[in-house]
A protein has these predicted regions:
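Interfaces that engage single-stranded nucleic acids at replication/repair/recombination sites
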Residues: 1-35, 43-44, 48-50, 54-55, ...
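Short, basic, glycine/proline-bearing loop/turn elements
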Residues: 2, 18-27, 59-66, 115-122, ...
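Conserved catalytic network of the ASCE P-loop NTPase/AAA+ motor domain
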Residues: 21, 80-85, 136-141
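Walker A/P-loop
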Residues: 38
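Short loop/helix-cap segments at secondary-structure boundaries that form the rim of catalytic
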Residues: 41-45, 55-62, 179
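Conserved nucleotide-sensing/catalytic segment adjacent to the nucleotide-binding pocket
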Residues: 57-118
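P-loop NTPase motor core
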Residues: 96-176
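Phosphate-binding/switch region of NTP-binding enzymes
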Residues: 144-222
Length: 278
């Protein structure tokens, strides 16, 4: 295939230096309703929440806009393209609703009712439109946090049989398009003491994922699996940042005992003087 003559490319001369700030990456928080996904995301610096569950962020001290349909979705992303210094962290709450807006618009354009199956053409058009939207979002110079509810799915095992797993409520197409951009998928849940934690390493029951290699480590360099979120979003955010910088379980150095040699020598001399008098 012939190349266009006006195309100019250059091979890199140096290795990429990864960002040290977690807010520069693309994250996914998922869990059941009212588990604290949005309130945790609202702790990130200079955030802006596009709220696809209108009213969900109204109780938070945050900057947000309720989004009601696909046309508004495209309009807000276009505005952010024009105002690239508007925020540092963009929160999409929640991403399955964005996909539903997209599919709803496709049905409308194809003259189908909401109860009608979209058919092959509908799924194909929706996939292309949604994929373009995610590309547009990912090119914005902000960190991105997507949220989703949880859902139980039956997964086939390699050796045969199935197992039920908790994962995001994203549909197959939505998940296929978005997953490749996400570095960390954290599942927010409650532990046996009824305290909130974020699981960032997957197991046979929960599909969480940590793509960071040199972060979220314990002092012995084993991976952190769960991050305690405490009793408030502020504590949760603080612990998340500490865990990212490998400081959540940092061993505290024992305090040094300072000895004043001058005073010690004076005390010894005084005791010796007293003994000589005896």
């Amino acid at each position: 295939m012939a190349l266009k003559k006006n195309i100019s490319v250059q091979l890199p001369e140096a290795y990429n230096v990864p960002e040290k700030d977690i807010s520069k990456y693309t994250l996914m928080f998922f869990g059941e309703k009212k588990c604290g996904k949005t309130s945790l995301a609202a702790q990130f610096p200079e955030h802006f929440i596009l709220e696809f569950e209108p009213g969900n962020a109204a109780h938070l001290n945050c900057r947000f806009a309720d989004v009601h349909n696909w046309e508004e979705t495209l309009a807000y992303i276009a505005l952010l393209k024009e105002n690239k210094d508007y925020c540092k962290t963009l929160v999409i709450d929640d991403i399955p609703s964005v996909y539903e807006y997209c599919m709803g618009q496709v049905r409308k354009d194809l003259g189908k009712a909401e109860t009608d199956k979209p058919g092959f053409d509908g799924y194909d058009v929706c996939k292309r439109r949604f994929n373009q939207l995610i590309k547009d979002i990912q090119t914005l110079p902000f960190g991105k946090i997507y949220t989703a509810h949880d859902k139980i799915r039956d997964c086939e095992l390699r050796g045969g049989g199935t197992i039920s797993q908790l994962e995001t409520s994203m549909s197959g197409q939505c998940k296929e398009i978005l997953d490749k951009y996400i570095t960390l998928t954290g599942y927010i849940k409650k532990d046996t003491k009824n305290e909130r934690i974020m699981q960032i390493e997957g197991d046979k029951f929960i599909k969480a994922n940590n793509g960071f290699k040199s972060h979220f480590l314990k002092p012995d360099e084993t991976k952190i699996t769960d991050i305690p979120l405490g009793t408030s979003p502020e504590i949760g955010y603080s612990n998340l940042i500490k865990a990212y910088h490998n400081e959540l379980y940092k061993v505290k150095a024992k305090p040094k005992i300072r000895i004043n040699k001058k005073n010690m020598d004076a005390d010894i001399n005084a005791k010796q003087h007293t003994l000589s008098e005896l």
